[in-house]
């Protein structure tokens, strides 16, 4: 394993713990006398005005749409490296997380509809348990440090990216009231320019980031989830140049400390503050939250593991190197952490309806995601090899 990957794993082990602590602090603040301070912090208005461009959003949305685009940029860089020359290199290995992600979206949605399909209003939330919160899932996995094989972590990253792309498409098709075709057109032109730069072997990272910033603004203005820009830019930055430099690896190395120690903990703090005020036991056990929780905790692993197993047995795909099905199952449970992406879909699905629907949706998401995190972490501890000890070379 290269030095950069070793450092990457060390950073995430510490960063994962910080992320969990940040989430716990947010949950405590949202359900205490500090709730007002917590909400005021998230509502701080932040505006950027450059000529005719005017973007004004509360701090929460800058964190979710802006800082998280940087996180997805790093994820895109790593997944591209593994697809090109790592554990996912080759068509039969690359298709494996795609098939798993498909199962991980279908099964939770079907289970949710078993609970809520008869109700015309709650039926609209069918996509809520289809999402995976890549940041929280990665943070929980990172608690196990270097026990996690690189291939398994990359499988989670690739699966979660495909899952997120699927959810973004679902949001655009079913939950977006208005899409700006003009902004999407400019975004398409920016993507074409990035692809051309990659084809010509442009090695200046700053050039990709500048075009990527334009792409981010256009996707944000279009009404589609802006973090998609980060993944696209990550895939377009060259892995190697003709002079044997690696712009991709250099950028990944530079951004990782910021992502692990600042962006992800801040994201967790901003999104984990779910208020439990006014919650009743009867409401908590109603069909809406139970459908969501069951979809996340049961549907996710059922869909991911079943589709993965069938793909391998039918010869459609191959397991990543040094990975077994016990580990795949543990990761599939971890993918039941829907959290922020699920909350985002719930806010769209029940917009303009009874506020109680959104509240109990969030509680179902919290219940399912927390259960998936605890059980997924416990299973990973059982199925992963013992912690590797550092060897001093004299």
Curated annotation (Swiss-Prot):
It is found in: Cell inner membrane. Pfam families: Na_H_antiport_1. GO terms for biological process: regulation of pH. It is a multi-pass membrane protein. Coiled coil: none annotated. The keyword tRNA processing does not apply. It comes from the Bacteria. Keywords: Antiport, Cell inner membrane, Cell membrane, Ion transport, Membrane, Sodium, Sodium transport, Transmembrane, Transmembrane helix, Transport. It catalyses: Na(+)(in) + 2 H(+)(out) = Na(+)(out) + 2 H(+)(in). One of its GO terms (molecular function) is sodium:proton antiporter activity. One of its GO terms (cellular component) is plasma membrane. The chain crosses the membrane at residues 14-34, 59-79, 95-115, 125-145, 154-174, 179-199, 213-233, 254-274, 292-312, 328-348, 363-383. InterPro entries: Na/H_antiporter_dom_sf (IPR023171), NhaA (IPR004670). Its main location: membrane. Belongs to the NhaA Na(+)/H(+) (TC 2.A.33) antiporter family. Na(+)/H(+) antiporter that extrudes sodium in exchange for external protons. This is Na(+)/H(+) antiporter NhaA.
């Amino acid at each position: 394993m290269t030095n950069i990957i070793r450092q990457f794993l060390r950073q995430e082990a510490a960063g994962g713990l910080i992320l969990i602590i940040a989430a716990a602090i947010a949950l405590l603040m949202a359900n205490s006398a500090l709730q007002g301070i917590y909400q005021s912090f998230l509502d701080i208005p932040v505006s950027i005005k450059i000529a005719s461009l005017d973007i004004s959003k509360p701090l929460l949305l800058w964190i979710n749409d802006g800082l998280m685009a940087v996180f997805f940029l790093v994820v895109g860089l790593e997944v591209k490296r593994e697809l090109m020359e790592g554990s996912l290199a080759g068509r039969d290995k690359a298709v494996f997380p795609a098939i798993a992600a498909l199962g991980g979206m279908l099964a939770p949605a079907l289970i949710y509809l078993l609970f809520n399909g008869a109700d015309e209003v709650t039926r609209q939330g069918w996509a809520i348990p289809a999402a995976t919160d890549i940041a929280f899932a990665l943070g929980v996995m990172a608690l196990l440090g270097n026990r996690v094989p690189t291939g398994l972590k990359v499988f989670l990253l690739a699966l979660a990216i495909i899952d997120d792309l699927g959810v973004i498409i679902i949001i655009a098709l079913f939950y977006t009231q208005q899409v700006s075709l003009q902004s999407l057109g400019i975004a398409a032109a920016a993507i074409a320019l990035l692809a051309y730069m990659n084809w010509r072997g442009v090695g200046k990272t700053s050039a990709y980031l500048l075009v990527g910033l334009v792409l981010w603004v256009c996707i944000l203005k279009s009404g589609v989830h802006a973090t998609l820009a980060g993944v696209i830019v990550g895939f377009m930055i060259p892995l190697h140049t003709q002079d044997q430099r690696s712009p991709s690896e250099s950028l990944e190395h530079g951004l990782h400390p910021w992502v692990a120690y600042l962006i992800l903990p801040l994201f967790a703090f901003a999104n984990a503050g779910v208020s439990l005020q006014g919650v009743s036991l009867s409401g908590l056990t109603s069909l809406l939250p139970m459908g969501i929780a069951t979809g996340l905790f049961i549907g996710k692993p059922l869909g991911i593991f079943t589709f993965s197993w069938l793909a391998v047995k039918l010869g459609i795909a191959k397991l990543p190197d040094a990975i077994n099905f016990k580990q795949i199952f543990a990761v599939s449970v971890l993918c039941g952490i829907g959290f922020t992406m699920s909350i985002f879909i719930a806010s769209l699905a029940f917009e303009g309806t009874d506020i109680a629907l959104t509240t109990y949706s969030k509680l179902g998401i919290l219940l399912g995601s927390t259960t998936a995190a605890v059980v997924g972490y416990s299973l990973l501890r059982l199925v992963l090899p013992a912690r590797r000890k550092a060897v001093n070379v004299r």
